[in-house]
Each structure stands twice: as C-alpha cells, then as structure tokens.
Amino acid sequence: MSGRGKGGKGLGKGGAKRHRKVLRDNIQGITKPAIRRLARRGGVKRISGLIYEEIRGVLKVFLENIIKDSVTYTEHARRKTVTAMDIVYSLKRQGRTLYGFGG
C-alpha cells in the first residue's frame, strides 16, 4: 500500500484538471414546464409569466441552505459522501421534517 491511507491505489488523486467545465446558470435547468408541473401538482391553475424567475431564485436559496447544512453534517462525521440522513437532519433543523428516508 505504501502509505496512501484509506484511498487504496491512489486513483483519482491526479493534478489539476486541464479542462474544467465552468458551472453557471445551472438554475436555468429548472425549466418553465418543470415549474409549471410542480405548480399543477400543488393545485395552481394559472401562472403569471413573472413567477418563473422568482421561483428559480427562491429554490436556489432553499437548496443552498440545505446543502450547506448537509455538508456541515458530513464534515463533522469526517466523511466525504453526503448521505440521505444528512439531508433529513438538515431539513429537520430548518423545521421541515421529512419522513420515509430512515432515522
């Protein structure tokens, strides 16, 4: 093993990536029809055109808060993988208890 720790053969520990995809405007991946479907599931009949950007902004803030908390739980447990329970605990901490995913 030659002192590489838990990582095994050291695969995936290479240098800097030459071509790294720049992540921006991913929130636009939440398409207008997807937002419309979610609204329909919630019982909405008609949707104003100004709603879509507003929903994207609110959703982005909500997910950032959940992910930030989840990563905090993961780092505290000295893990590198975010588990479903990290998400459940993050949601519970923010007052949105989710059932059906263990715990």
From Swiss-Prot:
SUPFAM superfamilies assigned to the protein according to its UniProt record, in alphabetical order: Histone-fold
Annotated compartments: Nucleus; Chromosome
Gene3D superfamilies: Histone, subunit A
Keyword list, A-Z: Chromosome, DNA-binding, Nucleosome core, Nucleus
UniProt GO MF annotations: DNA binding; protein heterodimerization activity; structural constituent of chromatin
Region feature Disordered, mapped onto this chain: 1-20
Comp. bias regions, Gly residues: 1-14
Residues in the DNA-binding region annotation: 17-21
Gene Ontology annotations for the cellular component aspect, listed alphabetically: nucleosome; nucleus
UniProt subunit comment: The nucleosome is a histone octamer containing two molecules each of H2A, H2B, H3 and H4 assembled in one H3-H4 heterotetramer and two H2A-H2B heterodimers. The octamer wraps approximately 147 bp of DNA.
Stated family: Belongs to the histone H4 family.
Stated role: Core component of nucleosome. Nucleosomes wrap and compact DNA into chromatin, limiting DNA accessibility to the cellular machineries which require DNA as a template. Histones thereby play a central role in transcription regulation, DNA repair, DNA replication and chromosomal stability. DNA accessibility is regulated via a complex set of post-translational modifications of histones, also called histone code, and nucleosome remodeling.
PANTHER family listed in its UniProt record: HISTONE H4
Name of this protein: Histone H4
Lineage, opening ranks: Eukaryota, Sar, Alveolata, Apicomplexa, Conoidasida
